[in-house]
Structures are given as C-alpha cells and as structure tokens.
Design a protein with these regions (language model features):
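Active-site beta->alpha loop and helix N-cap motifs at the rims of alpha/beta catalytic domains
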Residues: 2-189, 359-365
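C-terminal extensions of enzymes
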Residues: 290-387
Length: 387
C-alpha cells in the first residue's frame, strides 16, 4: 500500500458560522442575487461583495451552495433557500416542512445543515401561507418564537393578498410578534405588486412599521423596500425567481405555444424588465436603446434575442451591473428621508422617459407596440417619500 500523497487537489474547507453569530449585522443593507440551483454555480464578478451576496434557490440549493463555497471559492454573503414553499403549504399545526412529531428538532437540524453547507444565516423551511389563513400565519409565529438562535431568518412565503387593505393590519401585528428577522416572499402569477393599487403602499407600510424585515425572490421592489428600511432583499437572476406561485398552481407564461425562452433585460432608463423578444420587435424599425454598463459598454439592448447560454449569461451580467449600480447609489444617501427622496425622484424620472422613448421610436404606449409604465413603478414615483 503506497503512502505517497494524493496528487489531486482538495477543495478548501468551508468555513461555518456558529448559530450564536447574529444574522442582522451580516445581512444589513445588502441586495442579494437569487441564483437557481438547477445550474452549476460559477463566479459572478458583477456582484459587489460589500453590498450584495447570493441566495441559492431551489430543491438542490444546499448542494449547489456547498459547490459555490468549496469549488468556486465564493467567500461572500450566502443564503440557502430550498424553496419548500413551492411544494408544501403551511398549516397551523405544521407551519414548517418537517415530521409533526419532530417539528422543533427537525427545524433546528435544517438550520444547522444550511450553516454546514456554507450559509451566512439560516432560513426556516416555512410552507406557503395561503390567503387570509390566520391560523397558519400564527402557527409560523408560534414555532418561530421557539427557535433559540441568533442566526435565523423566519421565512414568510405569503400570498400577495396578505398585503390587501383587509389583511395588512393582521400581517403587521403577527410579524411584529416574531422575535427573529423576517424574510417575505410574495406569491402570485406574474408581478405580485401589479395586482392592485394597495399592494406597493402596504408593502412599504409593513417594512416601515416592523423592524428587521427582508424581501426575497423579487424584482426592483427590492430597492423600494431597501429605501424604506429593509434589512436586506433579493432579486432573482431570472423571471421565475422574481416571484413565487402557490404549490397547487402551474406557472402561467405570457408566451403561448412553447418554443425557446429568452432572457428578460433590465432597461436602465425605464427601470423595468422587458423580454428580449419584445425588445427585438419594438426596436425593429428604429435605433435601439443602448447601455453603458461594464458588460454592455455602449452596445444595444436588443442584442439578447438568442436562446444560447452565453447570451443568457451576458444578459444576467448586464442586469446585475445595472441594479447593482443603483444599490451602490442608494448606499451613498443617508437612510431615511434623504434615501427615500432619492428613490422617489429616480422612479419619477424613469416614468417620464416612457413617453419620450415611445415618441423617439414612433410607437404608442400599448402592450404590443410600445412601452407601458409598470404599475409598481408608477406607485413608487408618486407615493409620498415620507410613507
């Protein structure tokens, strides 16, 4: 038997944080990137490690997170979201996905396992909380308050109707009684914040009235809550990771008939995500919008109408550079009214550009021929900055 050393390089040991290391200071002020666990992790140079991080999301998230740490060598902020809420619905008796006779022990094991796989903080395995199901919501509160750890975020995967006029008061009251930091995930087909006019304002109210709230698996709503006092937030790398849908529903898509899928592109001047296919068509007879981010370097934004992996990665890098620059800008303003005013003015300026862009390319503001202002953006531009 040979005693010669093994010539194969060993992956570096993954550093783990004890459960007594508090989550709040490690996550404060960060806008994280939701990566999909179906893909092999890779470096993301576009991410600013001082203001961002990664949420590995999906059924294989723990293994992919470990790969990201051990194989890729990622040392930044990392959360593991196994997304149990996509298959499991919370009940009053079993709000977390675990055997009922082992609920507390199983939850603690889940949290420990996340930390062992390299997570900076741990997310509870909370099931989807259906509309107006007060007993399930209170069940989450009851079991969450049994957790004796400093490193835990209580995941709140709620139907967006919890932010309605009828339900927001109860949601705020229950969240206020959960003694750990909270991480909200909104459920609805397409954009949850576009459902009713009350939703953007009531989401702000939740984040203003309850301390240490986070909004994960979202879009530019991440920046709105950050401007209004959120602990942290997370933006999806692809459209399916910018919201969630209930376990008993299939994802609805705007495109019929199947076929290849194309990336969604963050428009820097208009502050919205638009599909590459739409951009290719809307700019078919005019000069396309361009971008000066590090990835684009002045190139046009209609170039992503391809379904290959390289084009998708380029589109993702553009998106990260774009919203990452806004996060950096926001951090330069003092938290409170100064930051809120900056954000409101930025959104208002973007709203004003829609008519100018439609006029420039000679189209009307219809879904088929031109750009329409998204309802949430319009709300962010008009709601009082003090709210």
């Amino acid at each position: 038997m040979s005693n010669a050393p093994d010539p194969r390089p060993r992956p570096p040991a993954v550093k783990t944080l004890d459960h007594t290391v508090a989550a709040v200071p490690l996550l404060q002020g960060r806008v994280l990137l939701h990566e999909h666990a179906q893909h092999t992790p890779r470096p993301r140079p576009a991410l600013d490690d001082s203001l961002s991080g990664v949420v590995m999301t999906g059924a294989n998230a723990d293994a992919r997170a470990f790969q990201l740490r051990a194989d890729v060598g990622y040392q930044g902020t990392l959360l593991i979201d196994s997304a149990v809420y996509t298959t499991y619905t919370a009940t009053a008796e079993e709000p977390f996905m675990a055997p009922p006779d082992e609920l507390f022990a199983a939850v603690d094991t889940s949290l420990n396992f996340q930390k062992a796989r390299g997570a900076t903080a741990a997310l509870t395995p909370t099931g989807y909380i259906p509309p107006a199901n007060s007993r399930a919501l209170k069940g989450v509160m009851r079991e969450a308050n049994r957790i004796e750890r400093a490193d835990t975020l209580v995941s709140l995967p709620i139907d967006v109707t919890w932010l309605s006029r009828e339900n927001i008061g109860q949601l705020i009251a229950v969240c206020d009684k959960i003694r750990h930091p909270k991480a909200v995930i909104l459920f609805r087909q397409f954009d949850p914040l576009g459902q009713t006019k009350d939703i953007p304002a009531n989401l702000r109210r939740l984040f203003t009235e309850v301390e240490y709230m986070s909004l994960l698996r979202t879009d530019l709503a991440a920046l709105d809550v950050m401007a209004h006092g959120a602990l942290c937030a997370g933006i999806g790398v692809q459209s399916s990771l910018r919201h969630a849908i209930p376990p008993d529903e299939k994802a609805q898509v705007g495109k019929r008939g199947g076929g290849p899928t194309y990336p969604h592109i963050l428009m820097p001047q208009l502050m919205c995500f638009k599909g590459a296919e739409f951009l290719s068509k809307v700019y078919g007879n005019s000069d396309p919008a361009t971008c000066d981010c590090e990835e684009c370097d002045g190139r046009s934004l209609d170039r992503f109408y391809l379904s290959d992996g390289e084009t998708r990665r380029e589109a993702e890098n553009h998106n990260i550079h774009t919203w990452g620059a806004w996060v950096s800008d926001m951090a330069s303003y003092r938290a409170g009214s100064e930051r809120k005013t900056w954000w409101r003015n930025k959104c208002a300026a973007a709203v004003d550009r829609y008519a100018l862009e439609n006029q420039r390319i000679g189209v009307g503001a219809s879904p088929k021929s031109g750009f329409q202002v998204p309802a949430p953006l319009k709300a962010w531009a008009t709601l009082p900055a003090t709210q």
